[in-house]
Amino acid sequence: ERTGGEFNHHNDFFTGRQGQEFASLQESYAYTYALGGMQIINHPGQYWSIDNTYSETQKDGPGWHANNFKTFPSLVGLEVYNQGDRRANDRILWDQILQRTMPTRNVFGYSGDDTHNNEQLFRNYNYMLMEDLTTEDLKDAMRKGESYFCYEPKGSGEGKAPRISAIEVDENSKTISIEANGLVHWIYATDKTSSAASSARSTIV
């Protein structure tokens, strides 16, 4: 769908589509859903402005995206880092979408190079937590959100991102536990009424 001279678009997976164009994004979502594929929305913050007020059904607003995620199970996530970190809007929009879909419908974040030349390589990537390197395991990881995204500003291709092997969410204790190798730097608020934050550094083995 063309918006302001660019295509408001998504990536398709497991469908064999050859770049067909549709009159609306919903038509494209429905087509991929019928084929049993999956989709990730590309840099949606480009088409949304935090300075504008959107109705819950207005195109490109958080309510509109949230409704699409609830309607089409084929939509598994959206880019929150794109071509480095071009648009912080992507993450703000992601948060507003999650406020409308959680806890019944999760929406997973992804990081994409959006590579148009060699200089744009190696900054954005995702680790998929898979038992085996198979298509079925990749599909399963995408459906369940068993992955984490990374952004390396310099794009050296040698960034030392933590290697996380497992993530466990405990709904009762409201905790997230991970198994990983590497250094993790946590930043968290000290209390709900204060804007002050503390940081803790721990080595995870």
Residue ranges and their predicted role:
Residues 33, 98-99, 103:
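Anion (oxyanion) recognition and catalysis
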Residues 6-9, 35, 74, 105, ...:
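Residues that flank catalytic or metal-binding motifs in active/ligand-binding sites
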Residues 27-28, 66-67, 175-177:
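Generic recognition of flexible, low-complexity loop/linker segments
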Residues 69-72, 103:
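Alpha-helix termination/capping residues and helix-transition junctions
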Residues 20, 70, 165-169:
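Short, exposed beta-strand/loop patches in secreted or surface proteins that constitute
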Residues 58-60, 181:
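Solvent-exposed residues in well-ordered beta-strands and their adjoining turns
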Residues 1-57, 64, 73, 79-94, ...:
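A metal-dependent hydrolase metal-coordination microenvironment
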Residues 101-108, 113-205:
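C-terminal functional module detector
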